[in-house]
Amino acid sequence: MSLEHEKDPGWQYLKRSREQQLADQSRPYDSKKNVWIPDAEEGYIEGVIKGPGPKADTVIVTAGGKDVTLKKDIVQEVNPPKFEKTEDMSNLTFLNDASVLWNLRSRYAAMLIYTYSGLFCVVINPYKRLPIYTDSVARMFMGKRRTEMPPHLFAVSDQAYRYMLQDHENQSMLITGESGAGKTENTKKVICYFATVGASQKAALKEGEKEVTLEDQIVQTNPVLEAFGNAKTVRNNNSSRFGKFIRIHFNKHGTLASCDIEHYLLEKSRVIRQAPGERCYHIFYQIYSDFKPQLRDELLLNHPISNYWFVAQAELLIDGIDDTEEFQLTDEAFDVLKFSPTEKMDCYRLMSAHMHMGNMKFKQRPREEQAEPDGQDEAERACNMYGIDVDQFLKALVSPRVKVGTEWVSKGQNVDQVHWAIGAMAKGLYARVFHWLVKKCNLTLDQKGIDRDYFIGVLDIAGFEIFDFNSFEQLWINFVNEKLQQFFNHHMFVLEQEEYAREGIQWTFIDFGLDLQACIELIEKPLGIISMLDEECIVPKATDMTLAQKLTDQHLGKHPNFEKPKPPKGKQGEAHFAMRHYAGTVRYNVLNWLEKNKDPLNDTVVSVMKASKKNDLLVEIWQDYTTQEEAAAAAKAGGGRKGGKSGSFMTVSMMYRESLNKLMTMLHKTHPHFIRCIIPNEKKQSGMIDAALVLNQLTCNGVLEGIRICRKGFPNRTQHPDFVQRYAILAAKEAKSSDDMKTCAGAILQALINQKQLNDEQFRIGHTKVFFKAGVVAHIEDLRDDKLNQIITGFQSAIRWYTATADAGARRKQLNSYIILQRNIRSWCVLRTWDWFLLFGKLRPQLKCGKMAEEMIKMAEEQKVLEAEAKKAESARKSQEEAYAKLSAERSKLLEALELTQGGSAAIEEKLTRLNSARQEVEKSLNDANDRLSEHEEKNADLEKQRRKAQQEVENLKKSIEAVDGNLAKSLEEKAAKENQIHSLQDEMNSQDETIGKINKEKKLLEENNRQLVDDLQAEEAKQAQANRLRGKLEQTLDEMEEAVEREKRIRAETEKSKRKVEGELKGAQETIDELSAIKLETDASLKKKEADIHALGVRIEDEQALANRLTRQSKENAQRIIEIEDELEHERQSRSKADRARAELQRELDELNERLDEQNKQLEIQQDNNKKKDSEIIKFRRDLDEKNMANEDQMAMIRRKNNDQISALTNTLDALQKSKAKIEKEKGVLQKELDDINAQVDQETKSRVEQERLAKQYEIQVAELQQKVDEQSRQIGEYTSTKGRLSNDNSDLARQVEELEIHLATINRAKTAFSSQLVEAKKAAEDELHERQEFHAACKNLEHELDQCHELLEEQINGKDDIQRQLSRINSEISQWKARYEGEGLVGSEELEELKRKQMNRVMDLQEALSAAQNKVISLEKAKGKLLAETEDARSDVDRHLTVIASLEKKQRAFDKIVDDWKRKVDDIQKEIDATTRDSRNTSTEVFKLRSSMDNLSEQIETLRRENKIFSQEIRDINEQITQGGRTYQEVHKSVRRLEQEKDELQHALDEAEAALEAEESKVLRLQIEVQQIRSEIEKRIQEKEEEFENTRKNHQRALESIQASLETEAKSKAELARAKKKLETDINQLEIALDHANKANVDAQKNLKKLFDQVKELQGQVDDEQRRREEIRENYLAAEKRLAIALSESEDLAHRIEASDKHKKQLEIEQAELKSSNTELIGNNAALSAMKRKVENEVQIARNELDEYLNELKASEERARKAAADADRLAEEVRQEQEHAVHVDRQRKSLELNAKELQAKIDDAERAMIQFGAKALAKVEDRVRSLEAELHSEQRRHQESIKGYTKQERRARELQFQVEEDKKAFDRLQENVEKLQQKIRVQKRQIEEAEEVATQNLSKFRQIQLALENAEERAEVAENSLVRMRGQVVRSATNK
């Protein structure tokens, strides 16, 4: 990075310094021992493997000073220090959770908050302000590639912006994360960056404007959306409670055009409810702030804010946020966004009304289920803000209007319902205001007059959520993230596939996007969670629990992602099911899901609000809402059609799913970029990482999922030169085996394979890179470290050997010196006393002076020699300096070229490396030489020493020079090679004149070929036109695009192979083409490419365009052009330093052009050779056209784009070649010099012919240019010919596609026809069903008529029973009571029930009075006429049986009426459903016809485009003809080409729009087809269900008719039996009178037993009733019944003993009665005994009476509970239906019980008659009956327990067993009637007991008065008969009233 960047204060937070990197990478590391181990607090900590563990799969790890034994699969590898704080985690050689966490932790500690992870950019919230978002930082990232700058949000944003401009593709940025992670802040920074970039592009056009700009408006949307959509949460003070997708539109030049916003998943519940520690939306607190004090008065906010319940449930203030300042920003943003003052005020008024509405109070009216307002102050304030009438508003809340049948009535609401309605209205109103705000912002940001060509979308949405309590909102948020993760996986898979395909890697691709498909289908597919939730919302009586049960039954054990939730732990809430997402298993609770999904509103309140006169905004936001009354009125006005809210019932899930589908469709059409925001800790503390929290977010955000995908492929990759440079040490010989880096890389890897260090599966070699599996790079790094250790060890040992050897040599020299010194010293000691030596010492100085001259001469000679050597060294130094200067210049040129091409090639970098090393060596050598020369000059006096030293230095210098010479030789060779290339180019330019002659000869042949090719091209274009016409048909079958993509990829790969093969073959044809034309063409192409780059960069476009214009003018005026070229060349020579970079680039491009020229020349030669075979090839093409009919539309579209790209490339090549022609001519220095020489010679020969000569030269140049143009046109013809061949192949494919897609279209048409026929059949079926319903109605009427007849028969039978009217009236009164009770359970209304209750009470009072009178009279009657009473009892039993039959028939009649009514209602519902289905079918047909008409319009548009294309083709043919004629000039061709390009672009744009429109229409057609299919299947399913129900109904009705017929027959028989019974009564009444006394005595004892039996039966009946009402209490009731039964049994035993005693006394009384006159004394004794027994019996009777009173009280309480249970009738009916499985079995048992009851009644009658003579036997029979009743009670209990057990198994069969329940009820009623008969008998027995008591006390004293008593009894009998007559009349009147 540049020094300027490093000076920025924010740079330290973006990238580490070099020193920090070295420090991080220098830590010790051992890949085999350093590991990560799990830690509870830190997540993972680093440890060192100490050794193997006690088991084979364990190791001992030392971490934190402790040894831990762990399993091997738990520990994770540590990455080498090279990857410490790496900027892209996908480069990690060990991709594991611990390494990812450590990398993020270490970078976050250094405040490097941005980190790449493959396609992700992970950002961690720093919890403090960092200077990394300033304008200076933004300018750093503008125009830079992602790899050039450190990770940053701006880098990703700029990449998206550049991709949009370069690839002409829409972009999207997906910013996700949990609340508080920084999504909103990053979104704002992204928007500001795009606004800055777009504005910078626009500034040049609109400089100096003062008005509000679009950039300002885009930025100002944030305060508005944050005020209404953000709130304080526990984690975040400014949390966005909604998701948004912001699309920023640009034009083709990158200028900001407009912006629009879409929002998702607004948290509506926050406006009425806030959790502790949280706050409502900011706007409520802002309007209450002090920014506009008068605003509070205007909004009637007179109370403290803490008094407003809706906004004051938790926090009121936020630390660090000033609501006054924020409100100022919000209000100013409203102004910037062009909100009018009225709109602002209306919006504030609605917010104030919301606060007032939360304080409205209501109370419950006494004794009514109706709420009423508790004060109207707050309601008046709210209505004042709404602009509506307060009375209407309150009435709409407490009494909304609902539709019942066909009428509208007011429904009373209780307090809870009113409060719930207020909350629902508050949520709905706020959501609509927020939607209006977004809509208004979009209207403001929609700028007119600027093209909206592309957009960049920014998605800010909540990330995955796994809470302790997960509800409806979490399901949808997680579903959205599931879809986004699938989108990312698929996108990453596509990029990996493209990368591997581009590099030629063979790999089996895995679409990881399919991994999440199962979970997504579980949620959104039919019978999925959302589908079943929507279904439950329309099912009557559905609850959240039924939804949970259905989900469990449908998916548990059947779907892998649906699980049973585990029990809650800790703070976890209850869950009903669990689902496995990619981020983990989530436990969901379904409470309130139905209400949240339906989100109902009070239509009456909405109608009141829509009528507001003072608040226009309120009217506007409710304008699109249609209430039920409005829909009914509209339907009535439109012909009786029914409708609901907006014509259909839309649940929240439906709306969410629709918006989500739109979002995913939009994202799939863009190039995505991913930003993942992370919360580091819950404490909001900067610099601290909570490992568990971060790992959970990485999982939820999909970062770890992305790493998992990386592991499956080859995540690590390295460029070939980099790989060779770094790992050449592993195979030095192989690294130098070739100049091709790819070959060297392959050789190195092969050497490692031979060494058994790697295998073939661990890597792949691509065209430019080497790809490695995860962990392989670390292994190779270890091998490199080992190799370096070996080399360094060997090097150190060699140095040690050298130093030791040198030391030994020095020591030997020292030893020799010592020896010499010692020898000389010894010699001196010997000579010092020698006389001759002394003489020598005296003469020696004189001899030395004499020889000084000789020494000086010698030294002078040596000096000369040294000076000569020094001069040589100096000259060598200068030559080295010159070489150094040359190398420096060459280096600067190469560096400039390298900088210009932005990266250069690996070969140039290697050359630069070698040149730099050579330069350094040369510099070092020069410095050494300079030092040595200076030393020679300074130390000239000591030449002897300097000479030795100089010699040594010269030797060293020679060695250095030799090394430098070697390097220079290499550099000179390379330079010579480049110069040779330049010379060859110049030679080629010199050979132009020679080639022109050859071209003239070939011109005619080429022209002939050209004409032939033009004809062929026209034929092919005709085929192309045919293909275009067929394209309109092909565009109707776009649904096969995905399969076509795969085939296209394979074909594309084959095409690329064939293309490379053809390109290799074309290289041999280079020598047959004009070299200058080819160079010109290729140079023009390179210049065109350069112009595109300059256009993208926007820096040098004006200079290049001026240069192009100058060159165009020079082509027209050749002489002036030559002069200008000379001036420009001179200028170029003067500014050579500035043009070196461009020249180097042109030189490189020229080399590339030469290669491409070779290829195209070979292509032309092959094309010319193939022209002779053109006819046969055309035949082959036609045959191929027939063979390739099965291709699809997607392939056609891609081929079309490819053709367009090729045409565009050819056009661009033409322009570029024409422009580069001028530059090439500037390089023709030799020609220009020759031209100068010729002009000079002409001037010297004759000045008069200068002008003529110049003109002649000009003509020659024009001829040459024309010839060049001809050559160029010839080349273009060749290219067009080759293009034509390719187009022929493409057209063949297109034709094959046409035929295939026509077949598919025919299939679709047939399918459509089938669908139409199915619709017709469905309509016919509906009509048939309607006809069947009409028949059913007729049958129902017949049944009703039959029932009326039954009623008449019943009335006749009732009227015919005058003789038994007393019993009949009693039974009818009981029937009326049970009927009232039955109706009170839900079949009649409360008012009718009260009316019936009053009537029944009156009847009961009358009956009680009559009963009292009758009892008083019957007492005396029974004394005298016992016989009559006995016969009456017999007749009563017969009447009871017949009345039971009559009651059964009446109940059957009522049940049948109810069944008929139910089926009528069902038939009406079915008719409604069929009508709705018919309407839907009509609507679908209408939409299909509309789509067909739109498709026809599109076809017409396509036909128009085809005609335009044909015109375009005709123009191309005209241009080709003009080219062959050579008559156009360069400027005309240039203009034509540009015009054609523009037309082509317009045509292509029109075609793209048409294709897009057609795709949209096709998708609509497909959706409609799916909907039609669903509707058809649903209709068939419903028809099948209704047919089954109708069949069951017919069967049940048939059974009912048979039962009624049988009942009628039985009733006729009963009537005959009654007549016979009447006669029998008349004959038997006298006999019964005689046996009265004995019966009374026997009945005294029997009554006791019967009373106990009555108590037991009554207990059983009470238990049955309680079981029906409260199933949960049945066990307790039965336990109580068992206790009472035990008591009854004990009492029964006591009574048995007492009866035995009384039997004895009775026998004695009989004997005494026979001998009454003779044994009076004995009777008195017996009378005393009877008196004692009487007292006992009286006590027992008193006890029984008390018990009877208790039971009567219980009966009254039961009746009270029955009245209260009227509201629970529906639930009881539901519970009854659940008992239907055993209904048949219970019916049989109860029939048998009924039979037993009848038998019991007969036995009782027999016992009554037999008691006269056989009292003891009667008592025994009573005991037997008691035992049988006990057994029946136990059996009934067991059967009821079995019914309870079968309850849970029979819910699903409730509907099927509906009619069986009715039969069960009837049987139960019969049983109840039997119980009532027993009760009546007990009453009679009670009276008989009283009479028996009187007889027992007075039988002796009043024996003589019997005759008088009989007379009195006769009188009372007459009175009783009159009473019976009166009672019979009452019964008749009551029956008539019924």
UniProtKB/Swiss-Prot annotation:
- Keywords, A to Z? Actin-binding, ATP-binding, Coiled coil, Cytoplasm, Methylation, Motor protein, Muscle protein, Myosin, Nucleotide-binding, Thick filament
GO biological process entries: muscle contraction; nematode pharyngeal pumping; sarcomere organization
Matching entries from InterPro entries are given as: Kinesin_motor_dom_sf, Myosin_head_motor_dom-like, Myosin_N, Myosin_S1_N, Myosin_tail, P-loop_NTPase, XRCC4-like_C
Could you state one GO cellular component term attached to this entry? striated muscle myosin thick filament
Disulfide cross-links: none
Where in the cell? Cytoplasm, Myofibril
Matching Pfam families: Myosin_head, Myosin_N, Myosin_tail_1
Q: For the region Alpha-helical tailpiece (short S2), what residue ranges are annotated? A: 846-1170
Other remarks on this protein: There are four different myosin heavy chains in C.elegans.
Concerning PANTHER family, the annotation shows: MYOSIN, MYOSIN-11
Q: How does it assemble?
A: Muscle myosin is a hexameric protein that consists of 2 heavy chain subunits (MHC), 2 alkali light chain subunits (MLC) and 2 regulatory light chain subunits (MLC-2). Interacts with itr-1 (via c-terminal coiled coil domain).
What is the name of this protein?
Myosin-1
To which species is this protein native? Caenorhabditis elegans
**Gene name on record?**
myo-1
